[in-house]
Amino acid sequence: MPKATRGVLIECDPSIKALIVNIDSSQHNIILDELDDTHLMIHPSMVEVVKQKLNKMLAENTYNPNEEAAKATGK
């Protein structure tokens, strides 16, 4: 008999998908299924966790010229 699992369909760029897979690699409770290069099925209760972790990762890896100028002037 078929088994159905409730999930949330996520459509994203392959680079963002790689970040989500990286997040899931430490916990293994986020991704229910990798559908293709741009689609994932994730656990409904983990949507906010994924958003928070992605925002944190993207903020850490975003170049901010104002921040570099402040470091250069010693502020």
From Swiss-Prot:
Whether Nucleus counts among this entry's keywords is: yes
**Gene3D superfamilies given in the database record:** TFB5-like
Highest rank taxon of the organism: Eukaryota
Q: Which InterPro entries match?
A: TFB5-like_sf, TFIIH_TTDA/Tfb5
- Which Pfam families does the annotation name? Tfb5
Q: Where in the cell is it found?
A: Nucleus
Keywords for the protein's UniProt record, in alphabetical order: DNA damage, DNA repair, Nucleus, Transcription, Transcription regulation
Cellular component (GO) terms are:
cytosol; transcription factor TFIIH core complex; transcription factor TFIIH holo complex
Homology family: Belongs to the TFB5 family.
The entry describes its oligomerization and partners as: Component of the 7-subunit TFIIH core complex composed of XPB/SSL2, XPD/RAD3, SSL1, TFB1, TFB2, TFB4 and TFB5, which is active in NER. The core complex associates with the 3-subunit CTD-kinase module TFIIK composed of CCL1, KIN28 and TFB3 to form the 10-subunit holoenzyme (holo-TFIIH) active in transcription.
The entry's protein name is General transcription and DNA repair factor IIH subunit TFB5
Gene name of the record: TFB5
